[in-house]
Amino acid sequence: MKRIMIVDDEENIRFLYKEELEEDGFMVELAKNGQEALDKLSLFKPDLITLDIKMPGMDGIETLKRIRETERHLPIIMCSAYGEYKQDFTTWASDAYLVKCADLTELKTTIRKLLGLL
């Protein structure tokens, strides 16, 4: 079973993604901010992370940089409520960029592609 970590400061987004992905057979761990994600990373050992860009404290971009220091090949999907960052995601060393909640089918398809399940 593939393991996914959802990192988002919005509780409703975390639980929506968790419910949808667990229905598809994924094991899901939640983190409400970047520091919590870093703390859980070595214990949960996710196969993929979805990471919100704008969060209080350590934002998604800083969290991504910290993760990449040790996890260069871990697929990471950057998420934002706005499409304004789409052109920047490759410079951050992320694997994909999605607008949050725009299309859960797109989220699930992107996850499957990055995990080699399609």
Question: What are these regions, as identified by a protein language model?
Answer:
Residues 15-23:
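Charged docking surfaces used in two-component/phosphorelay signaling
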Residues 25-32, 40:
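Short hydrophobic/Thr-rich beta-strand motif most characteristic of the beta2 strand and flanking loop
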Residues 32-36, 59-62:
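Acidic catalytic/metal-coordinating carboxylates
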Residues 62, 83-100, 105-109:
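Alpha4 helix (beta4-alpha4-beta5 surface) of REC/receiver domains from two-component response regulators
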